[in-house]
């Protein structure tokens, strides 16, 4: 990624915590209020993730990126030069790569790059991610993520 990405670790920490909540789904006590959040999807193969990306991008009104398998096993990433989301092979990496939160994160990178030209995890990325989450998982899931970002001091 070009430029300084000073918020990367904080965003990852907030999203990891949020993703763990989505793994369980259901009722969440949020500062005395009851929220109901969905259980995140887990895609069993690359085609299922591709289909999901197509649907989400249609929903938010952006052209869908290519989705391809990635050789490495440690992370997914977005390639701006080819508008490609690269996801580790779900069969060999286990379930983490096929989690909905991972795919939404990469969709947010795609959207942010198309609209702002940015690849960092700054304010524009977080705004895109919150919009994508609100549209796909609902406002309560987005509220939890926003609180995670705020708690991780993503200014």
Listing of model-derived features with the role each one plays in the protein:
Residues 1-101, 110-155:
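Active-site-proximal or metal-binding-adjacent scaffold patches in catalytic folds
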